[in-house]
Amino acid sequence: MRRSAVVLILALVVTALDGAVPGTAIGDHGGREITSLFTCDRPVSPPRCTSVGDGRTHHVAFDASLTAGLADSLRQAMEEAYDRPTKLTMVEQSRVTRKTDAVAFSDDYGENGAAGWVYCPVDAPQGVNPSGDRWCRQQEIHFNINPRYGVFFADDGSRDHVTCHELGHTLGLRHWGNPPQTDDGGVGATCMNANTPDGPTRLHQFDIDHINGYEYRRVPVPARSNGAPVPPRVLPWRGVVATTEVEPLPTTLGEMVNAADAVVLGHISLVVPGRVFGTRHDNPLHYASATLEVESVLAGALPWAHRSTLTLEIPLFDGPSSIADLPVWGESVFLLRNKGTSATEVGLPPERVRAESAYYRMLTFTGLVVNDDGTALTADDAGPLARLSGRSFEAAVSVILNAGR
């Protein structure tokens, strides 16, 4: 499988057909309609992007890296959660062909904050259908079997849930709200609930109705579909869209600040190639090591060795060459999780804990506030942090500082 995806973290650069732009659904209620979501134009953490299929027959290739347990669960999800209750026909494949809609992999991708994600490589066959949604073949489903995420793969029920969930993203199904309420106020039982290990293993009737009511258009595959260039994002951590994250987005700023191991004011001074994870297939995941110069600690604490500089790891889902596309942020507030904390929580050996303690990641994929010429800038879907966007950066820092007290 190719790794020239400009990352979908959505990585996908959409091929513009007749100037159409993929539609975006909004709202946090349950039972969201089928849609593609976000262009996938930057290597972020991790690439995640929802696309729709281009027909009612959905071909899924099982890569040799897929564990036996995940293969069994994915096979069951295809049959019991999708083929039987919907108008879709699910087809298992042992290799990738021109008909392949999704390819499933599993590997230890490192502690990047997500147990699974879906993305569409930029060089995969793709386009925009008459409904304005991006369709994509050969989408990649990645299950991260790093020990930190063992709870998502610990038993048949957990694997059944996560495979049903990620498969739904390849068809355009989106996360339900948190809690996953239906329009009548009830709680929906669906595998499309976000961040719920060992959650439901089937679709809600809303999901089934949306699949059955959507026109998955069969459109010609362009001879070449590199996509049109998209302007770089100021914030690469955009939306938590098609990932199964381990750290749920807190509902209040105080909860978010207190959940971080450290909240620091600082800037990225250097980005260099870092560690490499993944040996089960031929697409290893490279990381960038970003040097974060710490100006002050706003909340939490840092060990003595990291009080002036620390290493922030950034996954390079578009391959090692995409390190050149990463921004070197100016002054910003970073909400951080030390990877040693995660290693300790899952009971890794002391020597592994010590090794992982040298690295940090973002608490959530939107845990960043940038000083944009004196104004605070956040991702639109940064939860409590988004309320700081547009204020003076100085005022935003003060609010964060007070929230941690």
Give the ranges of each region predicted by the language model:
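Conserved hydrophobic positions within beta-strands
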Residues: 266-268
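Short boundary/loop segments of OB/S1/cold-shock single-stranded nucleic-acid-binding domains
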Residues: 241-259
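Disordered inhibitory propeptide/activation segment of secreted metzincin zinc metalloprotease zymogens
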Residues: 17-69, 220
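Secretory targeting and sorting signals
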Residues: 1-27, 228
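Netrin-like (NTR/C345C) domain of secreted extracellular proteins
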Residues: 222-240, 283, 317-405
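Metalloprotease/metallohydrolase-associated module, dominated by Zn2+-dependent proteases
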Residues: 28, 139-141, 148, 158, ...
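OB-fold (S1/OB) nucleic-acid-binding surfaces
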Residues: 278-314
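Metzincin-family zinc-dependent endopeptidase catalytic domain
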Residues: 71-182
